[in-house]
Every structure is written in structure tokens, then in C-alpha cells.
């Protein structure tokens, strides 16, 4: 059944015209949108979220989620949202730690030096395959990157770090094995143009809408 769901979602993504440009543009002008200098969040309905996931969610991400489970972030909103979140891993305020900000800068420096593929913390976000862990940051919501997405994973959590940034950079798995990451309950660093977030309280309805029951 799960294999059929993956094929159905992938088929819909291949056949349907992309709605991503429309969705992102709508987020910029919607009355319900809250925007910062480099971030936009728009509240949407669950049916809109389901449709966007089916037509625009990254196929590799969807495939891994179907195989292994959802990936979450903590968000401020209690309803489904279309998101272009500001990048904050370089900010000491994110973890209330200057060392954390330095760590992510060092991680990027190591990746840049090695010309490694994949995301960079300066233009990426962290999600985790554990709703309780995500809830420490707000309302736990499953995350569905839209369109082209790159991701990397390795440590159980990126911060607090158990290893030096250069060591982590050398051991990251990039754009592969996301289902393994999810099964292990690890964090994943990902970069995309926009994403859909659906609160865990609506997960049963989301699963029904996506045919994942």
C-alpha cells in the first residue's frame, strides 16, 4: 500500500502544473501573512496543504516520509502554513548561545573548503524526526519542503555538538538515506524555497488526505 501511495504522489507531482510560484507569491500578499525582512508565513487550510504536498512537495522527501515517518519543526502557528522562514542558525539568539552560532559558521566553512554538496546552515533549517523534540521549539508540525530540496544528516542533533564542526562536515550524508535518518529520530539540515507545515494535532486528517492511513 505504501508503495502505491509513493507512486500516486510522485505521479501527481509529475503531471500537475507547478503551484509553487503561485503559493509563494500568495504568501507575500495575503492578509493573514506575517512577514519579516527575510521570512513569510501564510496560514492555509488543511485541504490546501494536502494539495500543495501532492503537487509540489519534494518527491525524495515524500518517499522517505512514507517509508519511515514524519519530520517535524516547532512553529508558532496552530494551523497549517505555507512558510518561507528566515534563516537563523547563525544567530546566537536561536540557541541562546554564541558558541552555537560559531559552530554553524564553522560547519559551513568546513563544507565550503571541501566544496561539499548539500545545504549550508546559513541558508537552511533544521527539522527532527521526533515530534516531542520539535515541540520544545513551539507547536510540533510536520514539514514538507516544496520543489528542489537538498538535505544533510549525521549527528543525532547538530547542537549541542558532540564533535568538532570539521568532523561533522566530513561525516554528513547528503541527499541520501533520509528514511534511515527518520527511523533513527535524528535531525536533518535542509534547504528549500518554501515548505508546508501541518500541526501534529491535525496529523490524522493529513494522513487521511494523503492516503497514508
Indicate where each model-derived feature is located:
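ADP-ribosyltransferase catalytic core
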Residues: 112-172
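N-terminal secretory signal peptides and thylakoid transit peptides that target proteins
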Residues: 15-28
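Short, flexible beta-strand-to-coil junctions
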Residues: 10-11, 73-80, 129-131, 144-149, ...
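N-terminal chloroplast transit peptides
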Residues: 1-16
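ADP-ribose/NAD+-binding catalytic cleft of ART/PARP-like enzymes
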Residues: 36-120, 192-213
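Active-site and NAD+-binding cores of ADP-ribose-processing enzymes
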Residues: 145-213
Amino acid at each position: 500500500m505504501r508503495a502505491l501511495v509513493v507512486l500516486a504522489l510522485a505521479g501527481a507531482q509529475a503531471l500537475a502544473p507547478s503551484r509553487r510560484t503561485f503559493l509563494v507569491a500568495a504568501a507575500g500578499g495575503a492578509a493573514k501573512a506575517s512577514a519579516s525582512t527575510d521570512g513569510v508565513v501564510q496560514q492555509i487550510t488543511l485541504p490546501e496543504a494536502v494539495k500543495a504536498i501532492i503537487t509540489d512537495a519534494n518527491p525524495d522527501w515524500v518517499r522517505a516520509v512514507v517509508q519511515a515517518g514524519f519530520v517535524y519543526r516547532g512553529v508558532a502557528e496552530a494551523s497549517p502554513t505555507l512558510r518561507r522562514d528566515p534563516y537563523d542558525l547563525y544567530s546566537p539568539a536561536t540557541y541562546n548561545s554564541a558558541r552555537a552560532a560559531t559552530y554553524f559558521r564553522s560547519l559551513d566553512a568546513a563544507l565550503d573548503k571541501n566544496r561539499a554538496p548539500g545545504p549550508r546552515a546559513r541558508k537552511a533549517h533544521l527539522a527532527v524526526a521526533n515530534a516531542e523534540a520539535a515541540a520544545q521549539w513551539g507547536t510540533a508540525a510536520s514539514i514538507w519542503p516544496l520543489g528542489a530540496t537538498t538535505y544533510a544528516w549525521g549527528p543525532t542533533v547538530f547542537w549541542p555538538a558532540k564533535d568538532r564542526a570539521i568532523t561533522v562536515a566530513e561525516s554528513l550524508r547528503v541527499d541520501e538515506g533520509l528514511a534511515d535518518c527518520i527511523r533513527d529520530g535524528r535531525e536533518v539540515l535542509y534547504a528549500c524555497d518554501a515548505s508546508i507545515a501541518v500541526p501534529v494535532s491535525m496529523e490524522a486528517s493529513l494522513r487521511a488526505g494523503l492516503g497514508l492511513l
